């Protein structure tokens, strides 16, 4: 426990974990923007906190996440770095974060480069996971905006 109190946050912010992502992970606070949510999700992967990964995915997608596979992957992965390349506000409710996450598996360092979509629902930011089944373009958007998917999140993926 003391290690977490004195350790730098895995999100690479340079801050102590307890003053950075820990309040998010413990749901004492919520990230104010998509970039902070991205950093907190990276830290959650580094700390193998898959519950947080699920909780910060769009609520309509949470039941679709392969939780056991995510946990297995996290258990086999060591996260070694995060570079936020760009944070773009697309609208009041949508943002994109481009990042590179560096990780090691079986003593081999790899990089995951992604442009992620985030949506703000009821004053909280969530990750839109493109790897799970998505609505078709004419169905209601998964974020609950009452728009068709193609005119909301689907048009941004």
Swiss-Prot record:
Q: Where are the transmembrane segments?
A: none
Tell me where on the tree of life, at the top rank, the source sits.
Answer: Bacteria
The UniProt entry, under Pfam families, shows:
SEC-C (PF02810), YchJ_M-like (PF17775)
Q: Which InterPro entries match?
A: NTF2-like_dom_sf, SEC_C_motif, UPF0225, YchJ-like_M
Task: Fetch the NCBIfam families from UniProt.
Answer: PRK01752.1 (NF002486)
Q: Which family does it belong to?
A: Belongs to the UPF0225 family.
User: By what name is this protein known?
Assistant: UPF0225 protein PM1617
Source organism (scientific name):
Pasteurella multocida (strain Pm70)
Q: What is the lineage of its organism?
A: Bacteria, Pseudomonadati, Pseudomonadota, Gammaproteobacteria, Pasteurellales
